[in-house]
Amino acid sequence: MATDRSVRIGLIGAGAIGEDHARRLSTVIRGADVVAVHDVDPSRAKTVATRFRDARVIPDGNSLIGDPDVDAVVVASAAPTHEAYVLAAIAARKPVFCEKPLATTAAGCLRIVEAEKAHGRRFVRVGFMRRFDPAYLGLKAELRSGAIGHPLLAHLAHRNPAVPSTLRTTDAIADSLVHEMDLVRWLFDTEIREVRAVAGRRNAKAGPDLHDPLLVLVRMATDVVVDVELSLNIGYGYHIRAEIVGENGTVALASEQPIVRRISGEERRPVAQHWKTRFAAAYDAELSEWVRDVSQGRVSGPSAWDGYAATLATDAAAESLRSDTAVAAFPGDVPTLYREP
């Protein structure tokens, strides 16, 4: 689709991330109109739809995808629904922005890859927003500059203040760890070879079905070794860390907050309390680029193959916890459709 008019978007999912994307599409991003909204909770869909003059609430996600007034689809519903909605969008030959994970299993992601290959073109962009975060872009630029030499090790941390007591370990791995699995592939421009996940002493605040925290060791195809801390009930805030160790030095994300308080013999820095604020600029950038791409009839950014490779790694992490061994996670050669020119 190449057009001078606004892209008519159908939104599936009006929960936390869907509502935030709706706000973004209505107040930040130019060239987009949300014309249809679906959510399992009709009242929530209605609340989001009222932000847009002509948006309709549609009771069925597949009907939204097939609606002739919808040019492109944003899938921000619960993770287990992603695969079916994305496949329906591909079948309808409509561009689709899907929040991570692309599907809850690597097998599901691969079915999406095969559907795109059957059409001979891309339709899917996956919401790996960290690739658009200014701090991570700076980190990658430092790597590419060669200033620290060849990378050898990396230390990452993904910390949430709290999560629902009903969250399960497999869901935490699929929904949260998937960010780091995509991030390391993107930072190092190579695939993951194997994954080892370790669960130690449990945080007393974790629900009964959640191992928290987790430590995940990732070996890249280039033998770079990455350790990832996943702490989901850390209490103090939403905190993302990354440091890369090279042959000549290190490079790391700086503090997220420019303010330092020095009071009564103590030095304090405020910490972000939510992913919405920490990655607001990244969400703006990724959706702006997607809308621009759709209006110009092209697809770029994180692909279905990226979604597959990252979820293959999270599947491996879950299997590693069960088997207490390292698990292979190499996805194979990138199909021609997904190779960058």
From Swiss-Prot:
Disulfide bonds: none annotated. Gene3D superfamilies: Dihydrodipicolinate Reductase, domain 2 (3.30.360.10), NAD(P)-binding Rossmann-like Domain (3.40.50.720). Homotetramer. Belongs to the Gfo/Idh/MocA family. It catalyses: myo-inositol + NAD(+) = scyllo-inosose + NADH + H(+). InterPro entries: Gfo-Idh-MocA_inositol_DH (IPR050424), Gfo/Idh/MocA-like_OxRdtase_C (IPR004104), Gfo/Idh/MocA-like_OxRdtase_N (IPR000683), MI/DCI_dehydrogenase (IPR023794), NAD(P)-bd_dom_sf (IPR036291). One of its GO terms (molecular function) is inositol 2-dehydrogenase (NAD+) activity. Its EC number is 1.1.1.18. Pfam families: GFO_IDH_MocA, GFO_IDH_MocA_C. It comes from Acidothermus cellulolyticus (strain ATCC 43068 / DSM 8971 / 11B). GO terms for biological process: inositol catabolic process. Keywords: NAD, Oxidoreductase. This is Inositol 2-dehydrogenase. Involved in the oxidation of myo-inositol (MI) to 2-keto-myo-inositol (2KMI or 2-inosose). It is an enzyme of class 1 (oxidoreductase).
